[in-house]
C-alpha cells in the first residue's frame, strides 16, 4: 500500500457504494494501514452510502488499535450527520474494550439512533444500551450504565428484554440504575404493568420487581368485585387481542392457575389490606396456600408493615428505583434495609433458582 501511495495512488478513492479506502482499511483492522492512509490525506469523515464512517466500522468489528487512531481525526458533526454513534456499533458488536475507549474519549452514551436508522429495526431501538442488553453483554451494559446511560429510552423497554432472557444479573443491574418496573407494553396492553408476565414462574425475579416499586395494587384492581365476571370469547393472551386485561383474568387461565396461590401470597407482602374479586378467589380457594392467604386478607396488617408501606409511598417510586437516595434518609441501617425489603431480596442472598 505504501508503494502504491508513493507512486501516486489516490488515498481518497471510493468504491461504487462510496466506501472509502480508509473505511476498508478500518474494516480490516490494521492500524498501520489506517495510519498510513491518514498520512497520505485520507479523510476519516467521508461516509459510504449507508452513512457509516471508518470509525463505525472499526468499532463494530472490535478493532481497538484502528479505533484509537480514528477517534482523534473524526468530527463529531460527521457522526451526528450519520445518525449513528460508534458507541452503538461497539455495543452491537459486543466489544467492551472499544466501548470503554469511546466513553473515555467523550462520546455520548445517550446518543439516540436517527429515525432513518431506527426504521430498519423491527423494535425501533434507539439506544446503545438496548444493543448491549439484547446481546446479554454484561460488561458493556455495566460500562454504559456507569457512564450515565438511561435505561428507559427505547420503545421496547430494556428491562423487558432482560426479563425475557431470564438473566438475574442483567435485571438486577438495570433495576439498580433506574429501570422502570412499571412500564406498559404498547402491544396487547394489560391493566397491570407488563413486567409481571415474565416473572410468574420465578419468585426471585418476581421479588426483584416488587422490591423496586412494582405497582402491585393494580393487580388486585377489578371492576367486577364480588359479582360474576362476564365471559369473554377471546379470553387470555393471543397475538390479536388488544384490551385492558385484568390480572385476575390472566392468573386464572387454565395453564397458570397452579401458580396463583404462590404469586398472590408473595404479592401480599407488598400491599396494605386488599380485596380480591370473586373470580380470583374461586381459584385461590383450590390452592394449598389459601388458608394463609385468607388469614392475611381477613386480619389487620401489622403496624410495622404499614409503616414500611407508608415510608415507601412517601419516597416515591423514582427513589425506590434508585436506592442511592436512601443514603440521604436519617434512618438506621436496619430500618433502611427493612424499607427496601432486603429480607426478601433473594438474589442478593445468593438464591439463583427461582422456579416455584
UniProtKB/Swiss-Prot annotation:
Pathway(s) this gene product operates in, as recorded in its UniProt entry: Protein modification; protein ubiquitination
Pfam families noted in UniProt: Ank_2, SOCS_box
SUPFAM superfamilies the UniProt entry points to: Ankyrin repeat (SSF48403), SOCS box-like (SSF158235)
GO molecular function: ATP binding
Residues in SOCS box domain copies: 290-345
Role: Force generating protein of respiratory cilia. Produces force towards the minus ends of microtubules. Dynein has ATPase activity; the force-producing power stroke is thought to occur on release of ADP. Involved in sperm motility; implicated in sperm flagellar assembly.
Protein name: Dynein axonemal heavy chain 12
Organism: Bos taurus (Bovine)
